[in-house]
């Protein structure tokens, strides 16, 4: 079971952060992510995300995939700790309707789409063990930097160390801690608040 430990910070100007990430980290890819969130009767514990993603790797290879994710989310002091489960419905080349077929199944099971999110940006890894840094333009919300560490288990010591590393990297990137956004994107999009 992988546990995501992550934070996101709102940015006014992504250019200086992008420049610092190129000097601090290893560039991985550019991406476009189109997410549809599904739930049964507004029940948050039934939420499922279907993500259609196109990645252009640093070496120029292009990947298309449809991922399905559900998670148990906890937020502590602006840091998300997610027990995330994810699987691929289709990968590489055209979607071949894999995502459409899966969304048809969700519909038959009584789930309905309740929010959509579009995100484009770039990804780097920084340090060892790696922190994934994604610089994203989220449609209708603006620019964000997301920093994420994957842990093997939900251990309090590991969570505390990871939180410290994420906040330290935020400081290295000259991003004030008050720019950390603790609300999930879905909440911001639902409430129409950027």
Model-derived features with residue positions:
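Conserved, surface-exposed functional patches that form binding/active-site neighborhoods
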Residues: 109-156
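A short, polar/proline- and glycine-enriched secondary-structure boundary/capping micro-motif
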Residues: 78-83, 145-146, 157-159
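N-terminal strand-loop-strand beta-hairpin
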Residues: 1-129, 176-180, 184-194
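Mixed-charge, glycine-accented linear interaction segment located at domain edges/termini
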Residues: 154-184
């Amino acid at each position: 079971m992988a546990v995501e430990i992550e934070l996101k910070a709102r940015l006014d100007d992504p250019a200086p952060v992008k420049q610092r990430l190129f000097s601090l980290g290893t560039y991985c890819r550019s991406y476009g992510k189109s997410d549809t969130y599904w739930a049964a009767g507004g029940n948050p514990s039934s939420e499922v995300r279907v993500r259609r993603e196109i990645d252009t790797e640093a070496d120029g290879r292009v990947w298309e995939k449809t991922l399905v994710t559900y998670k148990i989310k906890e937020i502590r002091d602006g840091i998300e700790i997610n027990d995330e489960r994810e699987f691929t419905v289709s990968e590489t080349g055209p979607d071949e309707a894999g995502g459409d077929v899966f969304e048809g199944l969700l519909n038959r099971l009584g789930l309905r789409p309740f929010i959509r999110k579009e995100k484009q940006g770039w990804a780097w890894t920084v340090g060892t063990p790696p922190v994934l840094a994604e610089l994203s333009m989220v449609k209708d919300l603006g620019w964000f930097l997301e920093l994420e560490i994957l842990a093997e288990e939900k251990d309090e010591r590991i969570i505390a160390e990871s939180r410290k590393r994420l906040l330290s990297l935020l400081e290295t990137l000259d991003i004030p801690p008050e720019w950390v956004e603790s609300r999930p994107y879905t909440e911001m999009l639902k409430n129409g608040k950027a």
